[in-house]
């Protein structure tokens, strides 16, 4: 695949893991990042010690802080930045974007303020290239992908032809890519599971048991699906890799920043202390605010999201927020 060039934008853990996967596959791959110290370390030591320690980086991967150089002649652009930085990245690449390029987004979130999904943000910034947008989503910790551990994910977007191209690009013997045409469902599943992962971590931080976490995660999937259906998603998408799969891997894993953040909050740390200790972006924190506002606007019942919003932003004690869920009005289980 040497005739294809891929530029990965963002030298964090996920951008590093994906660019390394492609370089190992023989794809001409450039990794761009803003932090020149990280870029220099990757080129010098073949390791990203800050964001993906312990993973040896292919000698074929080129890392650079020069955006124009990185974008030159690229067939695929992989956006590996946090969701709240996605619009700014698009503005940066807009002057260089070409009609034949495919953008592969990996950010899982809802933009604060606008309450837009990443596909809608892309369409606002680059309206003439709407069909060039795709997203990779699913249960995929960068730490495990970097070590070659078998992983399965989903690609979604507007153009079936482009989905197949992305599927072919990323598929390896340990990285399996499925296509899914439900873009709304795939994006929402990946975004909203981070909220439930924080809440799951709070259960652990409070010293509660498996029963509590199982109930919370299962009911969390119900409210994620409820909002998705309201926005036009297919119910079955939330039973797949970008829904249940991503929720499963995020709501209880030592690799999950959102779960770890929840543990710290449950143990009594403030939001500011938690973010400082994690020292990387915790997508679910800002997604909680956006999802809460979206649910209020659409009149969708999301009790776990509402409780977490009050814990994070309105001073509600975590234990009080959790036990408040137990005393809500009685109802049927599968009430979408």
Swiss-Prot record:
Enzyme class: oxidoreductase
UniProt-listed Gene3D superfamilies: N-(1-d-carboxylethyl)-l-norvaline Dehydrogenase, domain 2, NAD(P)-binding Rossmann-like Domain
Locations listed in the record: Cytoplasm
InterPro entries: 6-PGluconate_DH-like_C_sf, 6PGD_dom2, G3P_DH_NAD-dep, G3P_DH_NAD-dep_C, G3P_DH_NAD-dep_N, NAD(P)-bd_dom_sf
Binding annotation for sn-glycerol 3-phosphate: 108, 138, 140, 193, 246, 256-258
Keyword terms of this UniProt record: Cytoplasm, Lipid biosynthesis, Lipid metabolism, NAD, NADP, Nucleotide-binding, Oxidoreductase, Phospholipid biosynthesis, Phospholipid metabolism
Substrates-to-products reaction catalysed: sn-glycerol 3-phosphate + NAD(+) = dihydroxyacetone phosphate + NADH + H(+); sn-glycerol 3-phosphate + NADP(+) = dihydroxyacetone phosphate + NADPH + H(+)
Family: Belongs to the NAD-dependent glycerol-3-phosphate dehydrogenase family.
Designated name of the protein: Glycerol-3-phosphate dehydrogenase [NAD(P)+]
